[in-house]
Each structure stands twice: as C-alpha cells, then as structure tokens.
Amino acid sequence: MTISANKRSVMSLFSDKNDIYSHQVRIVLAEKGVPYELENINPNTISEDFLELNPYANIPTLVDRDLVLFNSRIIMEYLDERFPHPPLMPVYPVLRGKSRLTMHRIEQDWYSLIDIVNKNPESKEAKKALSQLREEMLALGSVFAATSYFMSDEFSLVDCYIAPLLWRMHNLGVQFTGAGGKAIKAYMTKVFQRDSFSQSIGGSAPKHLMDDKE
C-alpha cells in the first residue's frame, strides 16, 4: 500500500481506535464536519510507507494533501484554524493562552496517569494511577459544575482533551461517586451525547450516566 502524501485528495487520519490521542482528533474532525479517510494503524506492525510519512511512527498522523502533521495538539489546532466554524478556541489571546495552559496541564497531570494504566491495566501501578486520576478529577467537581463545559460555556478543544480520558475511564469501569461525582457524571452525559462524540467512537455512547450509584 502506497500512502504518498501529495497524491491524496481527501484528508486522511492515521489512527488507532484504542488510542486516546487519536480519539481527540476524531472528535475535532466530527465537530468541524470535515470529510476524511480513516486509516487504522496497528502500532505493533508499522509499515515502511507509514514511516515515510512520519519517521516517529506515532499516531495520530494527519495528511492534508502535501502537509503531514503529527502530535494531537498540533493537529487539533491546525484543524481549528483550517476550518474556523464552529470555533473550538476562544477569540481573545488571554483566553486562548489559558486554554492552551489547561490542555498542557491535563496532558501532564492526567494523561501521564492514564498512560501508565494503558501499559498494563491489571498491574498494581495501573490501579494506583487510576485511583489517583479518579480522586484528582473528583476534587475538581466544582469546576465541572461551574460552567456548561470544562471552564467554558462553549464546547472547546479542552473538552476534546477531557472526553477521551473520561471515556477510557468509563470503559475501565471507573465509578465517580461521592463529592464531585454528580457534576462529573452530568458533564460526561452532556459530552457523550454530542453527535461528534458518537461519530468519534463509531456508535452510540451511554444515554445517561446519572443513574449510577452516587
């Protein structure tokens, strides 16, 4: 299979359905309503053709004609600028800076923990990391409750960071109970019901999470 970048007339996303970074980008593409070809990549069997596109052999990788991008944050910000409607970043520079800092902190503080879990979900280290992640998110219950979405009344790239993380935790059986749990479950219900989220997972998400045990 030849996957030369400059011969592709339709945008292509090289993705792994189980990779949360790829999931971020799929949500953005769905929000923007951008037609694209989805190429599922097995991280254990990387082809030479793919290595020609991305020498780091990581996913997600986006090909837009002769442009090849990797790193989910770079891809998402490119898509938001390339397709400005609906906007997924604030207009004002100060607010954009705050959004970027929030995404950086989510990646450093929370994604680092889920990465430990994904390596070996049954290990002692993974269970400890998952418990820590749950507790840290519950501690921000008031932040989840304060606005319609995370620190904003508009759906944004920050939510595209948080949604795949919460989806992964949901699939691992994590229950958000106790203080902060109600707000997080309300947020999950709202985000998981968005059309873009359903498209990003290739099917329907749970309709309502508020019936879970408090």
Curated annotation (Swiss-Prot):
<dbReference type="InterPro" id="IPR050983">
    <property type="entry name" value="GST_Omega/HSP26"/>
</dbReference>
<dbReference type="GO" id="GO:0005737">
    <property type="term" value="C:cytoplasm"/>
</dbReference>
<feature type="domain" description="GST N-terminal">
    <location>
        <begin position="9"/>
        <end position="87"/>
    </location>
</feature>
<feature type="domain" description="GST C-terminal">
    <location>
        <begin position="92"/>
        <end position="209"/>
    </location>
</feature>
<dbReference type="Pfam" id="PF02798">
    <property type="entry name" value="GST_N"/>
</dbReference>
<dbReference type="InterPro" id="IPR036249">
    <property type="entry name" value="Thioredoxin-like_sf"/>
</dbReference>
<protein>
    <recommendedName>
        <fullName>Stringent starvation protein A homolog</fullName>
    </recommendedName>
</protein>
<dbReference type="InterPro" id="IPR004045">
    <property type="entry name" value="Glutathione_S-Trfase_N"/>
</dbReference>
<dbReference type="InterPro" id="IPR034342">
    <property type="entry name" value="SspA_C"/>
</dbReference>
<dbReference type="InterPro" id="IPR010987">
    <property type="entry name" value="Glutathione-S-Trfase_C-like"/>
</dbReference>
<comment type="similarity">
    <text>Belongs to the GST superfamily. HSP26 family.</text>
</comment>
<dbReference type="Pfam" id="PF00043">
    <property type="entry name" value="GST_C"/>
</dbReference>
<dbReference type="InterPro" id="IPR004046">
    <property type="entry name" value="GST_C"/>
</dbReference>
<comment type="function">
    <text>Forms an equimolar complex with the RNA polymerase holoenzyme (RNAP) but not with the core enzyme.</text>
</comment>
<dbReference type="InterPro" id="IPR034341">
    <property type="entry name" value="SspA_N"/>
</dbReference>
<dbReference type="InterPro" id="IPR040079">
    <property type="entry name" value="Glutathione_S-Trfase"/>
</dbReference>
<dbReference type="InterPro" id="IPR036282">
    <property type="entry name" value="Glutathione-S-Trfase_C_sf"/>
</dbReference>
